Amino acid sequence: MRKANVIKGDMIFQWKYGFYMLYFIIIVIYLVLFSFLNGSVKNTIVSICIYSDPAAMGMFFMGALILMEKSQRIIPSIAVSPVTSREYILGKILSIGIISEIVGIILMVQRDSGNHFLCAVGIFAGSVIFSLCGIIVGTKIESLNQYIIWTIPFEIVGFVPVIVYRIGFLWNERIMLLHPGCSVMQLI
């Protein structure tokens, strides 16, 4: 029950600060852009957008959440609350994962092909990976500028191999599946 309350609290916090409105605007923009595409180009671009936004935006939203909680002095109060650090992190990951999954499914139905179940698994896995990266970076920094700078290495490692893999340069190379992002993209 406590875990559900932590997730609910995080989702209310996200709603209060406009995360859901931002996602709604992003979805509308993507749907308009996707309406101009067709065929394999559309499928590739939709797959990259599913990976980069619902999955990877978890890193940026997680950082924003942690910075807001730091500025409001919420994090020190967790130490004396009955919520464990494991429940706190799990609540963050699941709350971001839920919104990522919803957005990803909306984008996923824009493709002409693909396994929807595996795509949903990939979206959630990507969200978890990038949310954990966001927690790692978010706990080490004090300002938004620091956060943006510290996420650059995560972005390079998380995006460049995946985009190269997805657009076909190394699509048939099984060794690329050792990269967690490429494995997520394979599912998507």
Language-model features: where?
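Terminal transmembrane helical anchor/hairpin motif
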Residues: 161-188
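Short helix-loop junctions at transmembrane helix boundaries
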Residues: 108-119, 140, 167, 187
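Hydrophobic alpha-helical transmembrane segments of multi-pass membrane transport proteins
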Residues: 42-80, 84-105
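A structural motif at transmembrane helix-loop-helix junctions in multipass membrane proteins
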Residues: 18, 124-164
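Hydrophobic alpha-helical transmembrane segments of multi-pass membrane transport/permease proteins
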Residues: 13-40, 44-62, 150-162
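A short amphipathic helical element positioned immediately N-terminal to and/or at the very start
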Residues: 3-15, 187-188
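Short alpha-helical transmembrane interface motifs in multi-pass membrane proteins
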Residues: 55-60, 91, 114-122, 168-170
